[in-house]
């Protein structure tokens, strides 16, 4: 079939398998060009490995450090008549490229919050790898099914305390609007912490640890975003921020546990990037379009892959073997360039000036749109989008 982009809200409902494969190839090429990570991990589990920072982590481990990887994700395969999710095609492409280089690659398509997922991963590790030396936790899900009761809990992207009103961009109509978001209830805040906080990360490490499959010196990292006052009402000071603070709590507890065997647990605070997750957060697309333009001008721009490669090579797995630099809360900070005062001041000054008419001139909004559509495999140079393509792509994946 011939597949064209169809956008609904902040999701593109179609995906292009060849385009998704090209995205993965591009990240692999970038990783290889940067060179091998001297003290990199060798047996890595990535929970949430099909897109965004999780996918880049799997690529950094495999193609930057020759690591065996297990990826866990929840994606939909395509059929003969309907495309699957981008994450399915990303994972299929990763598996193909990893195997072509003789690297161990196993993927599990399942609910990562479930007990079954954890048991299956443990079984695989015992069978094939013995133990693992890194666990990346990179889940971004709006809903969590509690593993014991089966109850479905939903997260809320809302402020706390008062209604939040701010200038934003309507990405469907490409115009500047005033976005208003009502505050979260106490229940919504608690639910957001349940879905997006640190509990499941702890459950993963507990299960792996009790099964005896964590190597001494095993490192685990979970990803977070803090941002600045421009996005704080909806993010760090909102329901989502409470969940990310719970991630900090979990990191502290896990670090105490893992340090006994020379391991570590950290939250890595990353920069804002165009992902399916960030596009769903009010105000983020406009902020990203603004900050990207300034960072590009300053020569500081990083996408998911550049950011993760820097985390691996300059923080977690330094050539000199030293421990990573952390902030007062033991977080690894990779938002350091984005938070530079000149860059943030630029955004603060620009925010009130942006109109529908000057949006593309003052910000990198056009590039934002191009990167967004690229997440789904579209708008990539060298791909013939009028060519017939088969949306049914099979690969070595365990379905639970």
UniProtKB/Swiss-Prot annotation:
Per the UniProt entry, what are the Gene Ontology biological process annotations, in alphabetical order?
fatty acid biosynthetic process
Does the keyword Magnesium belong to this entry? no
Q: Which reaction does it catalyse?
A: a 2,3-saturated acyl-[ACP] + NAD(+) = a (2E)-enoyl-[ACP] + NADH + H(+)
**InterPro entries noted in UniProt:** Eno_Rdtase_FAD-bd_dom (IPR024906), Enoyl-CoA_Rdtase_cat_dom (IPR024910), FabV-like_NADH_b (IPR050048), Trans-2-enoyl-CoA_reductase (IPR010758)
Key words of the record = Fatty acid biosynthesis, Fatty acid metabolism, Lipid biosynthesis, Lipid metabolism, NAD, Oxidoreductase
**UniProt pathway:** Lipid metabolism; fatty acid biosynthesis
Is Kinase among the key words of this record?
no
Q: What is this protein called?
A: Enoyl-[acyl-carrier-protein] reductase [NADH]
Q: Which organism is it from?
A: Shewanella baltica (strain OS185)
Question: Gene that codes for this?
Answer: fabV
């Amino acid at each position: 079939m011939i597949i064209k982009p169809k956008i609904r809200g902040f999701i593109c409902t179609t995906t292009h398998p060849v385009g998704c494969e090209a995205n993965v190839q591009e990240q692999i090429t970038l990783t290889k060009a940067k060179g091998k990570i001297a003290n990199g991990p060798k047996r890595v589990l990535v929970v949430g490995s099909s897109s965004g920072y999780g996918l880049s982590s799997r690529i950094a481990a495999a193609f930057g450090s020759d690591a065996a990887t297990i990826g866990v994700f929840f994606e939909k395969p395509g059929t003969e008549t309907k495309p699957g999710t981008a994450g399915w095609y990303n994972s299929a492409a990763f598996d193909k490229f990893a195997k072509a280089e003789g690297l161990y690659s196993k993927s599990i398509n399942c609910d990562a919050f479930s007990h079954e997922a954890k048991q299956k991963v443990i079984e695989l590790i015992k069978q094939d790898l013995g133990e693992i030396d890194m666990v990346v936790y990179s889940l971004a899900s709006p809903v969590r099914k509690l593993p014991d009761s089966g109850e479905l809990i939903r997260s809320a992207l809302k402020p706390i305390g008062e209604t939040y009103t701010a200038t934003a961009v309507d990405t469907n109509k490409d115009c500047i609007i005033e976005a208003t978001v009502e505050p979260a209830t106490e229940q919504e805040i608690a639910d957001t912490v349940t879905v997006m906080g640190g509990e499941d990360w702890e459950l993963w490490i507990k299960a792996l640890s009790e099964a005896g499959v964590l190597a001494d010196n095993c490192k685990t990292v979970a990803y977070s975003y803090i941002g600045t006052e421009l996005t704080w009402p909806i993010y760090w000071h909102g329901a989502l921020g409470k969940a990310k603070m719970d991630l900090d709590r979990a990191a502290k507890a896990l670090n105490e546990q893992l340090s006994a065997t020379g391991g570590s647990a950290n939250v890595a605070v990353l920069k804002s990037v165009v992902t399916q997750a960030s596009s769903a957060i009010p105000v983020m697309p406009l902020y990203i379009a603004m900050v990207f333009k300034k960072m590009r001008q300053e020569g500081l721009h990083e996408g998911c892959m550049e950011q993760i490669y820097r985390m691996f090579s300059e923080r977690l797995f330094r050539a000199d073997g030293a421990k990573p630099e952390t902030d007062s809360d033991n977080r690894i900070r990779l938002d350091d360039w984005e938070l530079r005062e000149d860059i943030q001041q630029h955004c603060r000054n620009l925010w009130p000036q942006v109109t529908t008419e000057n949006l593309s001139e003052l910000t990198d909004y056009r590039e934002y749109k191009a990167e967004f559509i690229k997440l789904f495999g579209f708008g990539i140079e060298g791909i013939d989008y009028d060519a017939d393509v088969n949306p049914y792509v099979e690969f070595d994946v365990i379905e639970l």
